[in-house]
Amino acid sequence: MDKLIEIDKITAAYGSKVVLKDVSLTVWKDDFLGIIGPNGGGKTTLLKVILGLLQPVSGSIRFYQDGVPVSSLRIGYLPQLNNIDRKFPISVWEVVASGLAAEKPRFRSYTEAQKLRIDEVIRQMGLEELYTRSIGELSGGQLQRVLLGRSIVSRPQLLILDEPNSYVDKRFESRFYKLLEEINKESAI
């Protein structure tokens, strides 16, 4: 099994407040990991360090592809739902498509293959009937599925989920877990 991420003695802080101290972790290609702890325990901070959104005070993080060190990985990210502006005028299709933004030239249309991939992910999430709806019209669970679609449309090597089932409705919950099992065949979670 190939190593994907190696975190070695990371310390992270916000100003003078240390949130993580000497954290080490190795993530392997087919891993499905959960990080649990109390509110304010540093879970989201660790995710921010992995995503490159927060520079650690000390320690190192290394990424690998096929056992070879690389500067970065394709990472999909599903944020906590409370970080989303529901008033932003964007459709379900556009949100999922935005997960491919780095793969298309600016101000150009998506390729036919990309459009097919976007449509495939929308179907996979069970959102076909909401295709053109604005995100402001969606329930919390529907929006969570849209954001999950955005995070996987690029076929990431690593998928980071921050409180992924907090808004998933009971009707979709078992399908959600099966979906994560399917995604884990292509991505470490």
Q: What are these model-derived regions, one by one?
A:
Residues 51:
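Helix-to-loop junction immediately C-terminal to a conserved catalytic motif
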Residues 59-75:
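Conserved ABC transporter NBD signature motif
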Residues 134-138, 142:
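Conserved ABC ATPase signature
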Residues 155:
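Conserved catalytic motifs of ABC-family nucleotide-binding domains
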Residues 159-163:
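Catalytic Walker B motif of ABC-type/P-loop ATPase nucleotide-binding domains
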